Amino acid sequence: MGKRLISQNRGRGTPTYRAPSHKYKADLRHPRVDENSSLRGEVVGIEHDPARSAPIAKVAFENGEELFLLASEGIAVGNIIECGDDAEVKPGNIVPIGNVPEGFFICNVESKPNDGGKFVRSSGVYATVVTHEATRTAVSMPSGNIKWLNPKCRAVVGIVAGSGRVDRPWLKAGKKYHKMKTRAAKYPRVSAVAMNPRDHPFGGGAWKHPGKPTTVSRNAPPGRKVGLIAARRTGMKR
């Protein structure tokens, strides 16, 4: 008798396939600030968060609130961070993108005003302010896509810290394993053609080949719905 596929087991929501979110430090959001004012805070620590690739900064604000914010390059313990419409445009400060001069780098950009930050949050990435109009601001994303946003959307001035992460190799499988354990991912991933026939429709056989067409209908049952699902075309483009 066959077994459930990994894609079927994921849907059950067991701990194997769930992210250990109880270990995550905080949900990073820009602090709420009244219009035409600013809020100052001091960086009291730089910490690691298993939920993300970039370091986070613990900031104690003058209103008594302590928050974790995404750390930008150059931030250090003891630095002062400003947030609000009146904040100076310098690395680490949180300002509306409408106040940022063209050509400046920004990160942790809001999609809508006061949503806390949605875009450009991975280590070492940044967006660029391209141009301003009366009711919108153009921002060049890391992908090269130009996004038009409300000028009241806030962002952190500068580049996300931790830019050298992708240049450092893992070297040991154990380190990669423990990193993947912090995410909702099963690791290591076994190729379908390397499995037994009871584990996957593409498994079994004397050599590693699917043994059947890899295209499958959109309406196929869960145990068969693997491979190129409802593919319009297959193979290399000519």
Curated annotation (Swiss-Prot):
Subunit structure: Part of the 50S ribosomal subunit. Forms a bridge to the 30S subunit in the 70S ribosome.
Role noted for this protein: One of the primary rRNA binding proteins. Required for association of the 30S and 50S subunits to form the 70S ribosome, for tRNA binding and peptide bond formation. It has been suggested to have peptidyltransferase activity; this is somewhat controversial. Makes several contacts with the 16S rRNA in the 70S ribosome.
Molecular function GO labels: RNA binding; rRNA binding; structural constituent of ribosome
Keyword RNA-binding listed: yes
Name used for this protein in its record: Large ribosomal subunit protein uL2
A GO cellular-component term linked to this record: cytosolic large ribosomal subunit
Pfam families on file: Ribosomal_L2, Ribosomal_L2_C
Family the UniProt entry places it in: Belongs to the universal ribosomal protein uL2 family.
Annotated stretches, region: Disordered: 1-22, 202-223
Biased composition (Polar residues): 1-11
Gene3D superfamilies per record: 2.30.30.30, Nucleic acid-binding proteins, Ribosomal protein L2, domain 3
Keywords: Ribonucleoprotein, Ribosomal protein, RNA-binding, rRNA-binding
Species assigned in the record: Methanosarcina acetivorans (strain ATCC 35395 / DSM 2834 / JCM 12185 / C2A)
GO BP annotations listed: cytoplasmic translation
NCBIfam families for this protein: PRK09612.1
